[in-house]
Amino acid sequence: MPSTWQPIFAGQEAARATAAIDAIAGALAEWPSFPEDDPFGASLATGEAGLALFFSYLDRARPGARYADLAAERLERAIDRVAASFHRPGLYQGFVSIAWTVEHLRDRQDEDDPNEEIDRALFELLARTPWYDGHDLTSGLAGLGAYALERWPGATASACLARVCQRLEELAVPQEVGLAWPTAEWNLYPEERQRFPHGMINLGVAHGVPGVLPVLAQAAAVGAAPESARALLRGAVAWLLSRKLPAGGES
């Protein structure tokens, strides 16, 4: 199928954007290795895995400019440090962040599967109930589901997706309209905890209900979710739509 993608910018705007990309790429190419004692130094959000992803996509846009080598170097450093991240699973800064990056960038034709152990560990972790590590995309269930979707249709990945949906169902709280996933007070930053001492329901993608919806929807679409996940999705969408501000309203 031919691509329908079109550049966002043209002319002078495109030239300015290209110059900005060049400046960013140049700075990141000289970025030193993250310190060994940095707990997030291997991660997708703030570490080696994120730089590997950046340089890999830059190589696709500009092949032959040594970005592939930079991506490989950064990814190797991230993999070497995955054990240090094993005490936290999250998609942004835990061991799943490194595993997702490896899966996203690797050659699927390669018979060696570097993430089998990660899948097994995640499957065991997701058996835990009640679940205390939150629902969100950055460090909770939605992020683990995003990793499992990247690994789909692997058998263990499908089983992980089913467990993600089960844990989300257990955490869902009925609302006046639909249902939602509150963020407990112990999962809030200190300044947020002062404002919301009993927790809150977040409307952002990273930490809130919107980040859960595409994971549930895609899990249902690929047939990896229990039937109850569809009702869960409908309830969450209904709640989210009920939060829409009136015309001219301020958030």
Task: Label each residue range with its predicted role.
Residues 1-251:
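Glycan-recognition and catalytic cores of secretory/periplasmic carbohydrate-active enzymes
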